[in-house]
Amino acid sequence: MAPYIIWDWNGTLLDDVDAAVYALNRLLSERGLPTVTRDFYRAHFGFPARNFYIELGMDPDRDWERICVDFHRHIAEAPQAIRPDAVEALELARAHGLGQSILSALRQDLLLRDTGRDRLHGYFDEIYGVDNLDGASKLARGRQLVAQLRSRGLLPEGRALYFIGDTLHDAEVATEFGATPLLVDHGHQTAERLAATGCRVAESLPAAVRMVI
């Protein structure tokens, strides 16, 4: 049976790094803190996002809910689009009989809105986001997604499972729920950081799919 792919959304299929840097710098400016460059962001960002904000001088213990709400308000002001090679990769996977779902740390309603806006729902068996704006771990939802795929008969015993993402957290999550991690180097963390995991790193989404086929 052809393998199964679970895709990350933000930074992987969705090109939102510049939007995230814009939103982050709005947060920092509003709090009188120094802004950061895109390169700094990709070299330091990680999950849980709360720890990254502490590194930048914010105080999540005091106003974490406000930080999360403000970040998502600001990121909505910035242009975001699926990556130019995203549909090519999804079509390539479909043509080779690969199953596909999404797992994201984005809140479920926002994830469904964004994937619907880009008319991508038809590619995926399941689209799993989280129930908050925290930018924390998606591991629990990943386990639920795998259980759902198994209950639907889409992930029978022996079918190879891959998780394609763009962060160290994606590699950790994949390993925890039994998938092989594949990382792409265009997202929220640098290629150097990703390579240090020992995972395979692709230069494009179609290249990642070809590693699975």
Q: Regions from the language model: what does each represent?
A:
Residues 119-128, 193-212:
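Structural recognition of alpha->loop->beta junctions
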Residues 1-43, 55-57:
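Active-site neighborhood of HAD-like aspartate-dependent phosphohydrolases
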Residues 4, 138-171:
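Conserved Lys-Pro-Asp/Glu-containing loop-to-beta segment of HAD-superfamily phosphomonoesterases
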Residues 34, 59, 121-125, 155, ...:
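Conserved H-loop
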Residues 27, 47-61, 114, 145-147:
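Helix-loop "lid/cap" segments that line or gate small-molecule binding pockets
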Residues 163-202:
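Acidic, Mg2+-coordinating phosphoryl-transfer loop and its flanking beta/alpha structural elements
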Residues 76-102, 108-112:
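Short, acidic loop-to-helix structural element flanking the phosphoryl-transfer center
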Residues 39-41, 121-136, 160:
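A short, structured active-site edge motif that brings together acidic residues
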